[in-house]
């Protein structure tokens, strides 16, 4: 059996998958915020419960935000303070007496989608998350591409391209990002960015679901806003797709529930790509909240 953990700031979610990659059991517990020992105990107790339930010693994979394992062997994850700065993989491997594999949660999302039965035909899969932030991951021939610092796929911290400033106006504000830079596309293309753009142009503080509801009702202002957002998304993706050239782009995160994102994006891409480039297939993520657990479990299927 394959155990996949999706660990965030508020919850530790475990999914148990069989050899057919089907979910057999799942359980969630709160994430301890202050004690590393309590954090380790929470993970180990879930593993012990799964081992007993299924009568086996399952493999363990973990998806977690941040940098799962740097050169010093430690995890760096601001959202998981109890474990940040600790040698999480080594400590869990020792306590559980098995090989524990860690990866960035966005990479696990991409891996989950790349291993979907419908998508395994595609050699190079790009996962794109449009949620609270903007992130993603790359999977080539069924294996995640992590990079030296586990930041492959941090698309949200690419800067706005010149064409975006031409489109939006040269006085368009380059917002300061949490990473310390200015003009990162995450500040405009995330769910929060979607709402910020609306307020910037129309001076109304609406949240993304409210704007989308107006769009669905035919509101002209909301429709103009969505057109602008999709144009900005397309021009920003142009640079990424030119570098990566994926066969498939799978979009997850809260904004992926808005059908216009996946149905209208492809037609806007050709003018931002090389003339010889082929627009990749663009699909909404298939596995929703289970994606992180799936991808983490499948880290042991990539050998």
Curated annotation (Swiss-Prot):
It catalyses: N-acetyl-D-glucosamine + ATP = N-acetyl-D-glucosamine 6-phosphate + ADP + H(+). One of its GO terms (molecular function) is N-acetylglucosamine kinase activity. Keywords: ATP-binding, Carbohydrate metabolism, Kinase, Metal-binding, Nucleotide-binding, Transferase, Zinc. It is an enzyme of class 2 (transferase). Transmembrane segments: none annotated. Zn(2+) binds at residues 157, 177, 179, 184. Its EC number is 2.7.1.59. Pathway: Cell wall biogenesis; peptidoglycan recycling. Catalyzes the phosphorylation of N-acetyl-D-glucosamine (GlcNAc) derived from cell-wall degradation, yielding GlcNAc-6-P. Belongs to the ROK (NagC/XylR) family. NagK subfamily. This is N-acetyl-D-glucosamine kinase. It comes from Shigella flexneri. The lineage of its organism: Bacteria, Pseudomonadati, Pseudomonadota, Gammaproteobacteria, Enterobacterales. The gene is nagK.
